[in-house]
Amino acid sequence: MENDIMNIMNDIKYGYLDLNGNIHYVIDEDFDSKYKLQSPNETLNNKVGVCWDQVELERYLFDKKNIKFNTYFIVYYSDNICPTHTFLIYKIDNDYYWFEHSWEKYRGIRKYSSENSALNDIKEKFINDELSNNYDDTNLFIFKYSKPRYGINLLEFYHHCENGEKVK
């Protein structure tokens, strides 16, 4: 079942659709001002999305299959950049799984004994890969967030996620 979802996700490339309908395959200087969150159908049709868009498509697909899941936003607040990642963790029986498509290095499905152990592993990978272990733990947060409104911009997406439940 989850492999069917991954097969659908494998058609999606990393990048974003800007406000003018242009596709960008790299995060460029226009991202902050021109990004808009796509709906799952837009992501499917455009075959492009950053992690934020891809998780919304995953949300839609997991929901259709009635698989219990949560979505998370990890962010590191610093003066010049604020790296983020969104991801989905689902539960089947007593096991938890990290479903990852957009972060290519970790693409796949990983099994954990608890949701907390999954969150700790993802946090460690984010610190190692995105922050090069050079960070202040008081600036790193993970929020569990609900389905956002599609079409919102970057700051609106940040605010939506930050209004979720702070879990780490």
Predicted segment positions?
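A structural boundary/capping signal
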Residues: 1-168
